[in-house]
From Swiss-Prot:
Pathway: Lipid metabolism; fatty acid biosynthesis. Its EC number is 1.1.1.330. GO terms for biological process: fatty acid elongation; sphingolipid biosynthetic process; very long-chain fatty acid biosynthetic process. Gene3D superfamilies: NAD(P)-binding Rossmann-like Domain (3.40.50.720). It is an enzyme of class 1 (oxidoreductase). It is a single-pass membrane protein. NADP(+) binds at V79, D134, N161, K196, Y228, K232, V261, S263. The chain crosses the membrane at residues 28-48. It comes from Mycosarcoma maydis (Corn smut fungus). Keywords: Endoplasmic reticulum, Fatty acid biosynthesis, Fatty acid metabolism, Lipid biosynthesis, Lipid metabolism, Membrane, NADP, Oxidoreductase, Transmembrane, Transmembrane helix. Pfam families: adh_short. The active site is at Y228 (proton donor), K232 (lowers pka of active site tyr). This is Very-long-chain 3-oxoacyl-CoA reductase.
Length: 350
């Protein structure tokens, strides 16, 4: 009788009508059916939410963060790190077209000058500033130079794009100290230091957007890229903590959970439905600001590209984590073998 009463209580709690003529076994089956229906419903709602975020629901307007195409003298500034190639360059170009003045931060003064000239030619009236920093060095004088460059600017957007991965998949024990330290200095330390420089002003002005370039390697931990994966996992947790801290000051934080994009970092040259060009990717990001996309249920995180969003949803809600680790390990081992073979052939033909 106690079991029957307990099941009755559970059924009432989930809103199911109780038939007191049911046996305990029958009632248990009804309860399990209810739980199953709830699980399937939740599963379906998450999928619907994904498609709505990616294809239907509008994102935040960039005017929320100070874009002003009509009067660029009153427009806010966007600071973009890693701004001379790939995704970073595309963010700089598109944010300028949206009505922001641009601070370009990257390693090469020559490339910085080239991208600044490109922006000013394409979007007359947009002002640019440049700052050369080799983030791997952790040079205090270079950080002071950036601080001087942004001092007094009304910065509405910060794009922490700069990043570094391993030259090829490698076990942690075989990773060189130089490569390991470069990855942490670029992917973690630079993000913290630049953000600490910029975000207090956003908080004071009660307006801002911080976009941190993440990676699937930080969500689905990637063997053979352990240090890189760990650096991106850090960004995921840090972005969520930061987002909660500054949201009451109207500063929006979003970790962009990114799968493959055509870029120097990914070493991929051909685009597809699953692998966008930087232009396609950034267009989608700016169109869906404030939406989670495939990062359903993860605060301050977005997976905006449709193909990436589906992979994110599947790896989160469908595929077993242990299987993913094993599969990813096998893929990275194969990638390493191909890279070593290619390097060996290059040496022989030299």
């Amino acid at each position: 009788m106690a079991i029957e009463q307990h099941i009755d209580g559970l059924l009432r709690h989930v809103g199911l009508r109780v038939d007191h003529g049911l046996t305990p076994v029958s009632a248990s089956l009804v309860l399990l059916a209810g739980i199953g229906a709830l699980s399937v419903g939740t599963f379906a709602l998450r999928l619907v939410r994904l498609f709505a975020d990616v294809y239907i629901l509008p994102g935040n307007s960039v005017s929320k963060y100070g874009a002003n195409k009509k009067d660029l003298t009153r427009a806010s500034w966007a600071v973009v790190t890693g701004a001379t190639d790939g995704i970073g360059r595309e963010f700089a170009l598109q944010l300028a077209r949206k009505g922001f003045n641009i601070v370009l931060v990257s390693r090469s003064p020559e490339k910085l000058g080239s991208v600044a000239a490109e922006i000013e030619a394409a979007t007359p009236g947009v002002r640019t500033k440049t700052q050369a920093i080799d983030f791997a060095l952790g040079d205090e004088r270079q950080y002071e130079g950036l601080e001087h460059t942004v001092k007094g600017l009304n910065v509405g957007v910060l794009v922490n794009n700069v990043g570094k991965s391993h030259n090829m998949p490698v076990t942690f024990t075989e990773t060189s100290e130089e490569e390991m330290e470069d990855i942490i200095e670029i992917n973690v330390v630079s993000v913290l230091r630049v953000s600490k420089m910029i975000i207090p002003g956003m908080v004071d002005r009660k307006r801002g957007l911080v976009l941190n370039l993440g990676s699937f390697a930080g969500q689905v931990t990637t063997p053979m890229l352990a240090t890189y994966a760990g650096s991106k996992a850090f960004l995921s947790g840090w972005s969520q903590a930061l987002g909660e801290e500054v949201k009451r000051s109207n500063v929006d934080v979003s970790l962009l959970n990114t799968y493959f994009v055509v870029s120097n970092l990914s070493k991929i040259r051909k685009s597809s439905a699953m692998i966008p060009t930087p232009k396609q990717y950034v267009t989608q990001v700016l169109k869906t600001l404030g939406r989670n996309g495939g990062a359903v249920g993860r605060p301050y995180t977005a997976t905006p590209w449709p193909g990436h969003a589906l992979v994110d949803w599947a790896t989160t809600f469908v595929l077993p984590r242990g299987w993913l680790l094993s599969y990813t390990y096998g893929q990275q081992v194969a990638t390493r073998k191909r890279a070593l073979n290619k390097a060996h052939k290059a040496v022989k033909s030299a």
